[in-house]
Regions:
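C-terminal outer-membrane/trafficking sorting elements
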Residues: 6, 847-890
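Aromatic-lined carbohydrate-binding/catalytic grooves of carbohydrate-active enzymes
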Residues: 43, 47, 51-162
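Glycan-recognition surfaces
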Residues: 128, 134-137, 167, 182-272
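Carbohydrate-binding surface patches
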Residues: 260-263, 268-270, 306-348, 377
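Extracytoplasmic
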Residues: 337, 348-351, 379-535, 539, ...
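Intrinsically disordered, low-complexity Pro/Gly/Ser/Thr-rich segments with frequent PxxP/GP/PP motifs
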Residues: 361-387
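Amphipathic, heptad-repeat alpha-helical segments
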Residues: 529-572, 586-639
Length: 890
């Protein structure tokens, strides 16, 4: 069944990996993401034309895959009938056309009785068209008669028919083998089916369906970070079709495509290739990234470093255990992060030449390590060529193969092992629920040693009760290790010393009679040497040096890092001292990773304070604010805990809020205060602050199919001119493609308001959406946003800006928000990013000018706000006046 390009040599006794070339991941295009079931002969032929004309064929894309939507029931003989309107000439003519372009053709089916389109997309003729009960008939039709080269087999019908995945997918495999044809067979079960899938297919889906959005890409990557052990022998973890070139940002698209390449996932383009954007086309044709995906080793990258929310992954390319490796710095967080890699972490030594595979340029030659600044949601991928290759000294459990691993059924009910996350594990993940039978075991299949000899192996394990595991080296039983620690997440090392062969070794852990302890990692060093401690110390020093120069951190945290560096580089350290240093450094680095987001928040509010101070005219409240801000800065610089930094932030915000309410706190003429801080949850990042009942999702807010009054009441607001801004769009009824708006008859009765003043919210149809065609119908209807996700994308682009200016004549409350008193069914309002700005009235500045002009002759005169001289009339009530250029109460 498996198609082999170059002979693969596998030592079946222990499944060792040997330096060999294998069939590489599938590259092509699939119809589903853009066209769903609404496909046709012309569409498929057009995409084949586009693959060639856009130069995609030239860089390796070759499959044109027809997904769901071509079926139309079955004939009396049981053969799948082809949809007469979508494919009036049948599929053979389409397949021939694809082949005539020098491309390969793919088809779709379901393991059960019906397809997903018949269930989720209303394509009712797609019932009874799955493989179930017609395995050999369909295999002969698709591969002997129509001669398709690839098939994706879904499982909606399999669920519907209550089938067993392993049995049914194997039956389909056997039917395909019976045709005698070479076919790429993709399983689409939306979770890793089990290790059995490697024996019958060329790729298998590991997650639910991808969708056009960063959250989907991030989630799929998260589920595949620890799947490297299951990618081997020309068979691959399928992370689903590509959503590149649709609605995500440039950095998100780069992460999406770059990581799919790096993880050796099949690359199936999902957008319309006929109108693909130039930027997207350039990314999809990046030959250096594609080379990682199509590397002859066929390996998936594994995690070598995990700090905070960031990951560094690595894999061999070109030759196993050679001097050339690829690394990816992956930052899924919402902030820019400085990341550091010690070359020791990727088993490289000496001078290392670094090449940027996104930018196609040499970065230079480095020693020890490299530091990279990675924007939010971004990835940087490099090729490293080193002088020497070091033995790998740490093998995390999450890189090992679990023989009974599966993700379809509850692992506890099935009695199968899983990978679990915990902060106490070395890499943040451990292997648990092992044992109970021989097959529920853990194996590192390629433990490579440069020189034969005696080696000490350290197993980090945890178990609150006494548990054990047996160690097998290259098929030979070594010994049983008994483990008991103070808790399930408290890991302790258990050692054995054994002779090991030069080259590849396999180490298996099992317990066939009882549960095993949780396994964190295995580390290896030549007996009598301190390889592990020395390399860990070198890696830690690099991390500490990066931290010591991080301007986001407090001075005290940087000083603590510098002190540890000084101790670590003192020389002649005892092993006990190194262990203490490593422990202290790990604690500091963990603390810093936890504190960085709070440090960033502090800097945000400090910069916000500085900008408002810069905009302020001199006054006593301003001097008070400056003093308070300086105190906050002093407190921040010596802070080492979350509470201390949070207190500094709270003090900053309180000082600003107090200042804005001071009567004599005023901006300079021509300047304005940014008072957005007075609005709670101004960016809809949480679910509080606003009265009314909005829906919070996708980073914005929504009101749908109702009247509403979304508002906040700000108290003790001083007189002046307030400007309220927000992103907001309004649709009066269901989407009519803007017919009423274009005719000038659209009646919007929804408003942005401040007290009694209001302005109509911008119509949904008031702004065109140039990239609407890149979105599916769930986000784009008639060329306009049709979801909160789509609206938020447009808001981020600066669209649908609403603004209202309100003159507040006396101190009191300011109620601001969005409201609709009358509505028609399906009205929709989406909103985000409220801002509040303040400036004094012209009369105020005129008064100051008048006072300054008169000071030379009337230093002690007092003037009202309009600049008129104040007379001491005992009948006058107290009021705000200006004396010697300063506002006072008289």
């Amino acid at each position: 069944m498996k198609r082999i390009l170059i002979a693969i040599i596998i030592l079946l006794s222990s499944a060792h990996y040997i330096n060999a070339q294998v069939e590489t991941p599938t590259m092509g295009w699939s119809s589903w993401n853009t066209f769903s079931v609404n496909i046709s002969e012309d569409i498929i032929k057009g995409q084949a034309d586009a693959m060639v004309s856009q130069g995609l064929k030239d860089v390796g894309y070759q499959y044109i895959n027809i997904d769901d939507g071509f079926q139309y029931g079955r004939t009396a003989e049981g053969k799948v009938r082809i949809h007469p309107k979508r494919f009036p000439n049948g599929l053979r003519v389409v397949r021939d056309y694809i082949h005539s372009k020098g491309l390969k053709a793919g088809i779709y089916s379901d393991a059960g009785d019906c397809t997903c389109g018949s269930i989720s997309n209303g394509d009712t003729r797609n019932t009874n068209v799955g493989f179930y009960g017609y395995e050999q008939i369909d295999a002969d039709f698709y591969f002997k008669e129509l001669e398709f080269d690839f098939i994706k087999v879904d499982y909606c019908g399999g669920n519907h028919a209550g089938l067993n995945e392993k049995e049914q997918y194997t039956a389909i495999h056997d039917a395909i083998v019976n045709t005698g044809k070479n076919v790429r067979y993709n399983l689409c079960r939306w979770a890793y089916p089990g290790t059995w899938c490697h024996d019958i297919s060329t790729s298998w889906r590991t997650t639910g369906d991808i969708y056009n959005g960063w959250a989907s890409v991030k989630g799929i990557l998260d589920e595949n970070l620890y799947m490297s052990a299951y990618c081997y022998g020309g068979c691959y973890n399928d992370m689903d079709m590509l959503e590149v070139g649709r609605s995500m940002s440039e950095e998100e698209d780069k992460t999406h495509f770059g990581m799919w390449c790096f993880m050796s996932s099949p690359l199936l383009i999902g957008c319309n290739m006929a109108n693909i954007k130039e930027q997207t086309l350039s990314l999809l044709k990046n030959r250096e990234l594609i080379a990682l995906n199509q590397d002859p080793l066929g390996l998936q990258a594994y995690v070598v470093q995990h700090h905070g929310e960031t990951y560094i992954l690595a894999k061999d390319i070109l030759s196993l255990h050679g001097k050339t490796r690829a690394v990816a710095f992956y930052n899924p967080s919402d902030r820019e992060v400085e990341m550091y890699l010690s070359f020791s972490e990727v088993d490289l030594g000496g001078q290392v030449t670094v090449r940027d595979l996104f930018e196609h340029k040499e970065i230079g030659t480095m020693e020890k390590g490299m530091s990279v600044s990675v924007p939010p949601h971004a990835t940087r991928i490099y090729k490293l060529e080193a002088e020497t290759r070091l033995d790998r000294y740490i093998y995390e459990a999450e890189t090992a193969f679990m023989h009974d691993y599966q993700e379809i059924y509850n692992n506890q009910s099935a009695g199968t092992a899983i990978y679990e996350k915990t902060s106490s594990a070395s890499g943040g993940v451990f292997a648990g629920w092992l044992g109970g039978r021989r097959s529920n075991s853990l194996e590192w299949k390629d433990v490579h040693i440069a020189e034969a000899g005696d080696y000490t192996i350290h197993f980090a394990a945890a178990s609150k009760e006494s548990r054990s595991f047996n160690v097998v080296l290259n098929g030979e039983e070594l010994r049983r290790i008994v483990v008991q620690t103070t808790d399930w997440g408290v890991f302790k090392e258990y050692d054995i010393t054994v002779p090991m062969n030069a080259g590849s070794n396999a180490i298996l852990l099992y317990n066939e009679n009882g549960w095993m302890p949780n396994i964190d990692y295995m580390s290896i060093e030549k007996s009598g040497e301190n390889t592990i401690l020395n390399r860990r110390l070198e890696e830690t020093i690099g991390q500490l040096e990066m931290v010591s120069h991080n301007s986001l951190l407090t001075n005290k945290l940087r000083q603590n890092a510098e002190q540890l560096i000084k101790k670590a580089t003192a020389g002649n350290l005892l092993n006990s001292q190194i262990k203490t240093l490593l422990k202290d450094s790990k604690n500091l680095l963990n603390t810093i990773n936890q504190l960085i987001p709070t440090c960033i928040e502090y800097h945000y509010w400090k910069n916000y304070s500085d900008k408002n101070i810069e905009a302020s005219q001199e006054s006593t409240p301003l001097n008070t604010l400056k003093t308070k801000v300086e105190r906050c800065e002093t407190s921040f610089l010596i802070a080492t805990t979350q509470n201390q930094i949070s207190t500094a932030i709270k003090s900053l915000k309180t000082a600003l809020t107090t200042y804005f309410h001071e009567e004599s706190a005023m901006p300079k003429e021509g300047e304005q205060f940014d008072m957005t801080i007075l609005i709670s949850n101004y960016d809809f990042s949480s679910e509080d602050g606003w009265k009314g009942e909005p829906t919070y999702r996708s980073g914005c807010g929504e009101e749908f199919n109702k009247t509403f009054d979304l508002h906040q009441i700000l108290t003790n607001m001083k007189p002046g001119i307030y400007t309220i801004k927000c992103n907001a769009l309004y649709r009066t009824r269901n989407n009519d493609a803007g017919a009423a708006y274009k005719a000038g008859t659209e009646n919007i009765q929804a408003y942005l308001y401040a007290n009694e003043k209001k302005v109509k919210i911008k119509s949904l149809y008031s702004e065109t959406w140039p990239n609407a065609s890149l979105f599916s119908s769930s986000d784009n209807l008639n060329g306009y946003p049709h979801s909160m996700h789509a609206a938020n994308i447009r808001f981020a682009e600066g669209c649908y800006q609403n603004e209202l200016q309100y003159s507040h004549t006396e101190r009191g409350t300011l109620q601001l928000g969005l409201k609709c008193n009358n509505y028609i069914n399906d009205n929709w309002c989406c909103f985000d990013n409220f801002e509040l700005h303040y400036q004094a009235t012209k009369d105020y500045y005129d008064g100051i000018t008048s006072v300054q002009h008169s000071e030379q002759t009337a230093q002690n005169d007092t003037y009202d706000l309009s600049g008129r001289k104040y007379t001491d009339d005992k009948n006058n009530t107290k009021e705000i006046v200006i004396k010697n250029g300063i506002k006072i109460l008289r």
